[in-house]
């Protein structure tokens, strides 16, 4: 069973720095589990590791799709499995740095996956058809799948048609099981919030608005990347609806709320997670990993 280290935690908690530290100490490579760092061109607002940091330790699943593309949790897991297998085959330790809790949960096999990204245009066309027509289409595409679906439920029939056309049933997909050491970084609430506020200000100082303008030029709120905290709050500023300071405060507030949701999710949805205090997380994790590998 492949061993992996998983480092989770809220935004601005220091996951990237800790992952680099562990990867350097234990001959590892880092796999990003962040739903927004997958996008090319979204560097400042997603707090991506720098080029210099990537030269210290190889990083994977960063800058893998264009910002106008959609990307599902199933696609993440498929790619992550491949990368982890490659890292382990080369005798290195896969270190997962995860800001997106449901990515981590899915990778660990703790939740069912939807292996087909939903195509909104296709769904709209299918919804126009009658239920009997849809059932006929499903039976023609996959009789086995049709026998397992509630044929009186139009939404489920539509989803089954999509799976039959484009994807695989989950039971047909064999996934690896990992021996995972899972840790989370925790800070006192006031310290975490201060880290969040400082980082938001630094992003703005570092040129965040150029990324915001680029997102707006290719779709704005209509694309998945345009829904990210740190970007969407500045769209009203670019349109002249709020001040720069108001937009920054909105980013800070939304980021703090998001951090609270992340912590709640990790505490209740990721079994076996070991919490480390942010001030000595590197020292504690080094000890944990050493004992675990031995």
Curated annotation (Swiss-Prot):
Belongs to the IPP transferase family. Monomer. Residues 155-159 are annotated as: Interaction with substrate tRNA. GO terms for molecular function: ATP binding; tRNA dimethylallyltransferase activity. ATP binds at residues 9-16. Its EC number is 2.5.1.75. The lineage of its organism: Bacteria, Bacillati, Bacillota, Bacilli, Lactobacillales. Substrate binds at residues 11-16. GO terms for biological process: tRNA modification. The record marks 100 as: Interaction with substrate tRNA. Keywords: ATP-binding, Magnesium, Nucleotide-binding, Transferase, tRNA processing. Gene3D superfamilies: 1.10.20.140, P-loop containing nucleotide triphosphate hydrolases. Its cofactor is Mg(2+). This is tRNA dimethylallyltransferase. It catalyses: adenosine(37) in tRNA + dimethylallyl diphosphate = N(6)-dimethylallyladenosine(37) in tRNA + diphosphate.
